[in-house]
């Protein structure tokens, strides 16, 4: 019995690729190209420099990572420690916005194939969320990935900026943290993407037992990696068995599950190649999240 279970499980996950390759195009429109952290491969991520270059490369949407300063101002920054990307150190919420904007967000940025750190002599400040919004076209969709706990100070500050700038209607709030997603969902005036936990559960239910459950949430965005390394664990009386799988959980059936009777929009994360983009188009994804807008601008041709 354990042997049959393991084989069936691998087929259910691994077989997705072969099925998807044979599918007809799922939609006539190209998927939106969304710049991940404003184009983290091309320029220092989450900076106005990256935003303006991603816009020039023709992206359709902007994915920005947001935390809040000690004085309550939302800024763009992803890691938990400023030392990861900048010439500073410590958490974002340990410094005022004025202190944060004196740091160089490109301090540790490197370009593949180029020696050194090209932005150490060219300061690229950490922008506020308001500055970032001002650098995008007024009709561009923004995806705001909230990366800081406790959630409420960040959620409230983001809501205030979106209201003040008039950008709430074109902004989707997202987080991998369930508490942040819940807090954002309670905040008046915010459009919030589906919880990653719910998205992941529905995708695995579709892959493993072909059930579209939990029920899709009408009108929301949902996202997950186009390819995802996962570990499947099976428990036995005398221990456990583990299988490592590179899963393609998005396929035509899962996309249809999310959209069926709900109008959900779906995004594939970590789309890195033209073949990934073609697969996303084939199965009908609404958008793809890319690290290099400069590379992605060629995929549509």
UniProtKB/Swiss-Prot annotation:
Gene3D superfamilies: Phosphatidylinositol (PI) phosphodiesterase
Keyword annotations of the record: Signal
Gene Ontology biological process terms, A to Z: lipid metabolic process
CDD domains: GDPD_Rv2277c_like
Keyword DNA-binding: no
InterPro entries: GP_PDE_dom (IPR030395), PLC-like_Pdiesterase_TIM-brl (IPR017946)
Disulfide links within the chain: none
Superkingdom field: Bacteria
Entry keyword annotation includes Signal: yes
Protein name as catalogued: Uncharacterized protein Rv2277c
Gene source species: Mycobacterium tuberculosis (strain ATCC 25618 / H37Rv)
């Amino acid at each position: 019995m354990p042997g049959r279970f393991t084989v069936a499980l691998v087929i259910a996950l691994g077989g997705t690729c072969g099925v998807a390759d044979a599918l007809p195009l799922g939609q006539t429109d190209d998927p939106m190209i969304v710049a991940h952290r404003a184009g983290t491969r091309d320029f220092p991520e989450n900076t106005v420099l990256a935003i303006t270059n991603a816009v020039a490369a023709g992206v359709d949407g902007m994915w920005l990572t947001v935390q809040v300063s000690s004085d309550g101002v939302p800024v763009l920054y992803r890691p938990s420690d400023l030392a990861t990307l900048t010439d500073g150190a410590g958490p974002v919420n340990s410094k005022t916005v004025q202190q944060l904007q004196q740091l160089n967000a490109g301090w540790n940025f490197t370009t593949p194939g180029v020696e050194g750190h090209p932005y150490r002599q060219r300061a690229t400040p950490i922008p506020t969320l308001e500055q970032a919004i001002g650098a995008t076209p007024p009709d561009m969709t923004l995806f705001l990935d909230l990366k800081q706990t406790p959630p409420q100070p960040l959620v409230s500050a983001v809501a205030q900026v979106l209201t003040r700038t008039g950008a709430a209607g074109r902004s989707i709030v997202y987080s991998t943290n369930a508490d942040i997603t819940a807090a954002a969902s309670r905040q008046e005036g915010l459009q919030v993407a589906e919880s990653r936990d719910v998205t992941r559960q529905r995708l695995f239910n579709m892959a493993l037992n072909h059930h579209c459950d939990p029920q899709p949430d009408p009108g929301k965005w949902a996202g997950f990696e186009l390819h995802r390394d996962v570990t499947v664990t099976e428990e036995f009386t005398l221990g456990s068995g583990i299988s490592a799988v590179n899963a393609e959980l998005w396929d035509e059936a899962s996309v249809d599950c999310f959209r069926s009777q709900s109008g959900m929009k779906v995004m594939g994360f970590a789309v890195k190649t033209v073949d990934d983009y073609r697969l996303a188009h084939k199965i009908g994804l609404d958008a793809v999240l890319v690290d290099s807008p400069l590379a992605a601008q060629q995929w549509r041709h």
